[in-house]
C-alpha cells in the first residue's frame, strides 16, 4: 500500500525535468526577442513566438509550484525551488513586456546597443540552461555553477553599460528633434535592461543554493 502511495507522488527528479523545460522556453523566448530586433517583418513574426513561449513557461511554473506542495522529499529547500522557478519565470515575463512595448509603439528600427543588449539576453538564457542540470549535482558542480552565475552577472554589468551609452546617444540624436522617438527608445532600453536584471536575479538565487549546499 505504501509503495503504491509513493508511486502516485511526484518524484524528486521531476523538478529537474521541469526546470529544464522552463529553461528551454526561456531560451526560445530570448532568441525570438533578439530576432524581433532585426526589424521589418521579423518583428510581428517573432512577437508571437515570445508570447507562446511565455505561456509555455507559465504552464511549467504552475507544475513546479504544485509539485512543491505534493512532494515529500525535494532536491533542495522548497523556498529555494519556488524562488528559482519564480525568478526564471520573471525573466520571460519581462521579455513579454519588452515585446509588447515594441509592438505597442510600432518600433521597427533598433540601435546597435539595443541589439547587443538582446545578444546578452540570449547568452544569459543559454547560461541558465547550462546551469539548470548541474543543480542535480550541486556538491560536485559547485565551481562550475559559480562560474556560470558569475558570467550572468558580468553580462548584466555589460548591459548596464550599453544602456547608458545607447541612451546618451539617443538623447543627443532625438531629445530635441524627435521627443517621441526619444521616449520610445528610452522605453525599449528600459525594458531590455530589466530583462537582464531578471536573469541576474536567477543567478543570485542559484548562487545562494550553491552556498547552502557546499
Per-region residue spans from a language model:
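Cytosolic, long alpha-helical scaffolding segments
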Residues: 1-214
